[in-house]
From Swiss-Prot:
Keywords: Cytoplasm, Queuosine biosynthesis, S-adenosyl-L-methionine, Transferase. This is S-adenosylmethionine:tRNA ribosyltransferase-isomerase. One of its GO terms (biological process) is tRNA wobble guanine modification. The gene is queA. NCBIfam families: PRK00147.1, queA. It comes from the Bacteria. Its EC number is 2.4.99.17. It catalyses: 7-aminomethyl-7-carbaguanosine(34) in tRNA + S-adenosyl-L-methionine = epoxyqueuosine(34) in tRNA + adenine + L-methionine + 2 H(+).
Length: 343
């Protein structure tokens, strides 16, 4: 398939620049893969489409204030964007840097009160590896000196409101540089309604990386290579998902990040495996889903890996038809936009 097969016209004014006043106030489009029909609804009523016994798998990653503004030891201004923590006991991160002259290994960075960095060897362009020095807890230091990294299509500076609204209500594990945005619609009240209906809600963690915004640069989508992201599947989640599959109950993934993690961590026998690792799975049409029966997701960019993923689940023509309808109905797109449920 060609990249152009996943293109569509999107008016700029439909790209949501701010969240709605209430999380659950978004609109919802429901796609039935069997009947090839779609319905328009309100997200607040999403529980109506769940059944007792369904398992909803959520990504509990927490967005960190990954944008750091500081200066090099020579005095020049530098912006450091944390992308992914590297394995090890020290806080060494793959980072993107923006400055007049790219820093070399050994360059010291002053990044705010109580936080310094040193550029170390390693890192394939455009990334630099930076080892951070600080007192206390790294995540708390970041909360004090870092800035929330809004996506590039949100054309404004982050505000204090984004610190809470660009997080899900179930965010627990710090490490993402972008939110798992399908989860932004959920409130504690909606989660309680789902539980009362008999829906199991199980967490996993995938720390969303900057690559989620990177465009595909190959016309043949099979040549695209996904970025790596750190993930963790708890024992309890693996057990709950495997029981559901054994019983013929549905597993519904909240977001493309949960989908990719579930389908990456499954073994040859179709059993979800608990544990940690790095995920670089690219799901495209022709992929055989072994865990995921349904998906809650936002409306994605044209020609993006995320749009390709939802097309793999629901069918390319059906998805593009749905997106055309969403544009006509003036649905809001991308991170702070409206929502889709694929069943």
């Amino acid at each position: 398939m060609r990249l152009s097969d996943f293109d569509f016209e999107l008016p700029e004014e439909l790209i949501a620049q701010h969240p709605l006043a209430q999380r659950q106030a978004s609109r919802l489009m429901v796609l039935n893969r069997v009947t090839q029909q779609l319905q328009l609804a309100q997200f607040a009523d999403i529980a109506d489409w769940f059944r007792p016994g369904d398992v909803l798998v959520v990504n509990d990653t927490r967005v960190i204030p990954a944008r750091l503004i500081g200066r090099k030891q020579t005095g020049g201004r530098i912006e450091v964007f944390l992308v992914r923590r590297l394995p090890g006991v020290e806080e060494v991160w793959a980072c993107l840097t923006k400055c007049s002259k790219s820093p070399r290994p050994g360059t010291r960075l002053i990044l705010g009160e109580g936080l310094e960095g040193t550029v170390v060897e390693g890192g394939e362009p455009p990334y630099r590896h930076v080892r951070f020095s600080f007192q206390g807890d790294f995540s708390q230091v970041l909360e004090q000196v870092g800035r929330i990294p809004l996506p590039p299509y949100i054309r404004r500076e982050a505000t204090p409101d984004d610190r809470s609204r660009y997080q899900t209500v179930f965010a627990r594990e710090a490490g993402a540089v972008a939110a798992p945005t399908a989860g932004l619609h959920f409130t504690d009240e909606i989660l309680d309604v789902l539980r009362a209906k008999g829906v199991e809600i199980q967490p996993l963690t995938l720390h969303v990386g900057l690559g989620t915004f990177l465009p595909m640069r190959t016309d043949d989508i099979t040549e695209h290579r996904m970025h790596e992201e750190n993930y963790f599947v708890p024992e309890g989640t693996a057990a709950a998902v495997n029981r559901a599959k054994d019983d013929g109950r549905r597993v519904i993934a909240l977001g493309t990040t949960s989908t990719r993690t579930l389908e990456y961590a499954v073994d040859e026998q179709g059993r979800l495996q608990a544990g940690a690792g790095t995920c670089d799975l690219f799901i495209r049409p022709g992929f055989k889903f072994r865990i995921v029966d349904g998906l809650v997701t936002n409306f994605h960019l044209p020609c993006s890996t995320l749009l390709v993923l939802v097309a793999a689940l629901a069918g390319r023509e059906f998805i593009l038809e749905a997106y055309q309808r969403a544009v006509a109905e003036k649905f809001r797109f991308f991170s702070y936009g409206d929502c889709m449920l694929i069943l």
